[in-house]
């Protein structure tokens, strides 16, 4: 049973300093899930958290990267490089793609720090000074000697490998041309500003672990002329309107809450606190973040492939043009507007549903589904959303898009199916345990 509460909170100091709105999470240990034991690899998981936070800070800096899904690639590259740097030395888990040569006495913590630094410098060269400062601080805590030097060399090699692997992945290709449809159900730019469709080519980016973006084909969405679609659309029409009288106050808060921050940032913040709460070792932390961010990156690629393959119109279009749907159970309302602005891409599958299910599936493999979480956002007013487990948080993230007028329940269910499938594949490839 899901438990949700809303409380006023203080802005997170780190987020204010960075000038960005990011969530934080307070996790309560569950007696049913074992806590991390003593570090089995030199170093702690804190350095992995530090580099993850650094990337979030970079993404919040002005003019570093426009609003885009590119950060899912950046998170995956960062975490895969740290992961490979560690497992190339410890051989504790299968490498991502392939290991790099590593002396047996090399320090894994030095390797992880160097790998993280080098990947982020390659992605965001204008941030080198701050990244150099962070690297020097992390390495200063590691005893000098040959093992440290060897670790630095392994980390640099792991970063070079990751950068080379992703150098021609299609992420920098010009957006693919998209011709908007005019028939019932066809996606087209949405009111009020009618922006051009975004991320039209992201489904063609080379996945990190999927064989291809279509590996998990979703069932075709139901026709807009059918009863199933009408029922789903009418739910959004009632609950998702800006002036809805059927949406509860708590649902309104949730709809705005999950719209305020990129969902991949939210789930990385969740992972940060789970790792910190369990005092995870370096190896444990790199395992967790690699599973999370490789899942998010490949889900994003597969999701955009599906979105532009199906090109389903958004609820705001369907409702305002309802008379053109050819469905007697859909009554148009040209005055209808959603609670939050509509994203400039097709509706099915839902992004929050897909990405949150992927994240929850990955994290549940390590922490179980009985880990209470309380996610805090710095949007005005600041609120905390509390849940009995990761699955409940993911479920609300997806349903919030119905309450915000962004997606139908059909989109939500398709997204959940896709995100779960991708995350389970990633966990299998990294030989991490799966649950459920």
Could you tell me what each predicted segment is?
Residues 1-29:
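Secretory targeting and sorting signals
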Residues 27, 33-436:
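Acidic/polar surface patches and capping/hinge elements
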